[in-house]
């Protein structure tokens, strides 16, 4: 796994009237503070990125559909500099959260049928939004 990228298994609780999907607790590994949270949708076959956050740690969860994340490390001095990492998140296969450290490039691709939805949480608010 790339330095600065971690994947954390999450709880998916099946209940008769609608399932519960955990996302992030302040006691979870990968949580470094709260700045903002928002949802983003992506259509099947669409790609978004490349984007790099220099100060934010991102925690990403896909509760609907499937999204492939491609991460690139160009951080000078990093043991994984020059490497790519691909990780697909989906509630259907091993529901988990992706944590991405500051300074890494990231793009993502909609792999689920129809529209996929992802939850972004970060430790700092994006001042542009």
Model-derived features: positions:
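Conserved small/polar residues in nucleotide/adenosyl-binding loops
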Residues: 120-125
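A short, N-terminal "cap"/entry segment at the start of jelly-roll beta-barrel domains
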Residues: 1-33
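The conserved catalytic core of RNA pseudouridine synthases
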Residues: 76-78, 83-94
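Glycine- and acidic-residue-biased ligand/ion/polar-headgroup-sensing regions
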Residues: 57, 62-68, 73-74
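A short Gly-Trp-Pro
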Residues: 1-4, 47, 85-89
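Conserved metal-binding segment of the jelly-roll/cupin
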Residues: 90-111
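Conserved short histidine dyad/triad with adjacent acidic residue
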Residues: 39-54
């Amino acid at each position: 796994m790339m330095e600065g990228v971690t994947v954390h298994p999450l709880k998916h609780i099946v209940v008769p009237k609608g399932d519960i999907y955990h996302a992030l607790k302040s006691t979870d590994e990968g949580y470094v503070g709260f700045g903002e949270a928002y949802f983003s949708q992506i259509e099947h076959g669409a790609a978004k990125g490349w984007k790099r956050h220099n100060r934010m740690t991102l925690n990403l969860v896909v509760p609907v559909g499937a999204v492939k994340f491609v991460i690139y490390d160009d951080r000078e001095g990093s043991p994984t500099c020059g490497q790519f990492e691909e990780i697909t998140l989906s509630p259907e296969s091993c529901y988990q959260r992706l944590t991405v450290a500051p300074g890494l490039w990231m793009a993502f691709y909609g792999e689920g049928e129809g529209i996929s939805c992802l939850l972004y949480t970060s430790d700092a608010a994006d001042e542009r939004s």
